[in-house]
Amino acid sequence: MNKTKPPVIVLIGPTAVGKTKLSVMLAERLNAEIISGDSMQIYKRMDIGTAKIREEEMNGVPHHLIDIKEPTESFSVAEYQEIVRQKIAEIDRRGKLPMIVGGTGLYIQSVLYDYSFTEEAGDPEFRAEMEAFSAKRGAEYVHDLLKERDPEAARAIHPNNKRRVIRALEILHTTGKTMSEHMEGQRKELLYTTALIGLTMEREVLYDRINSRVDQMMDEGLLDEVKLLYDENVRNCQSVQAIGYKELYAHLEGRASLEEAVETLKRNSRRYAKRQLTWFRNQMDVAWFDMTPPVNIEQKKQEIFTYIAGKLEL
């Protein structure tokens, strides 16, 4: 193993593919600590909708970057990058392996490569113009502009993530480069000795699992969880733009029946899974492992362990 570069395991994959359970099994065997690579699990009191791991499921494996922010607080990829790099150093010093687990591709990528999140390639005047467009015509209008000019970024960035949509347009306007080209220009080499594992699944099977997971979330009390945030007056915040929250907000505000909101949630979750896979395949050099049932989880764990051991020279 390259001793100058700390070892890091990264386990990625779309929502509902089975990352959580497998990550704990691997962490137990590898003496690893898990860092959440999900941009929404950072928020307190947002447990069901973000599919946050329960304490009893952790099996004593330390988990980081969960429940660190109030739902009213914003959180950026630059902040994530800084905190996670500190965590990796801390875990490495303890003689344990850091394992990043999640589905927010840009967040994970920002940690692994030496991306700079300064105001380089910034144009405050253009940004203000786009913000005015968004306020006047809606987030979808600005996202459609991005879709015309940088389809890949548009697929990776949710329309309601206004700040990131505008930033992608700003980079294009200032540099003439797409978001990916701009980041590729910064992407010299990995900062860590990295074993990058991806879990995938046949699309129809994955979509069925997503639909079932949404039904399970509703049974577990997702509507009550969202209503608590709504009653706390958590509005127009980054946190409740998350899938699972904005759809049920539409119901609570009388813009959709509960049945319509749940169907929209399922559809948005399926689309998000598709965007996640597109991002990972286009942006990252991943060793993919198929989790389509029937799958022998112990055998799959062994295959992944063997890959990690070879990659990190364990």
Curated annotation (Swiss-Prot):
Site (Interaction with substrate tRNA) location in chain: 104, 127
Residue spans crossing the bilayer: none
Binding, ATP: 13-20
Top EC class, one word: transferase
UniProt name for this protein: tRNA dimethylallyltransferase
Source organism of the structure: Bacillus licheniformis (strain ATCC 14580 / DSM 13 / JCM 2505 / CCUG 7422 / NBRC 12200 / NCIMB 9375 / NCTC 10341 / NRRL NRS-1264 / Gibson 46)
SUPFAM superfamilies named in the record: P-loop containing nucleoside triphosphate hydrolases
Region annotated Interaction with substrate tRNA, chain positions: 38-41
E.C. designation(s): 2.5.1.75
Alphabetized NCBIfam families for the sequence: miaA
Keywords: ATP-binding, Magnesium, Nucleotide-binding, Transferase, tRNA processing
KW Protein biosynthesis (keyword) present: no
Name of the gene encoding the protein in the UniProt record: miaA
GO molecular function: ATP binding; tRNA dimethylallyltransferase activity
Cofactor(s) listed: Mg(2+)
Record-stated family: Belongs to the IPP transferase family.
One GO term (biological process): tRNA modification
Function: Catalyzes the transfer of a dimethylallyl group onto the adenine at position 37 in tRNAs that read codons beginning with uridine, leading to the formation of N6-(dimethylallyl)adenosine (i(6)A).
Gene3D superfamilies (alphabetical): 1.10.20.140, P-loop containing nucleotide triphosphate hydrolases
Coiled coil: none
Superkingdom, taxonomy of origin: Bacteria
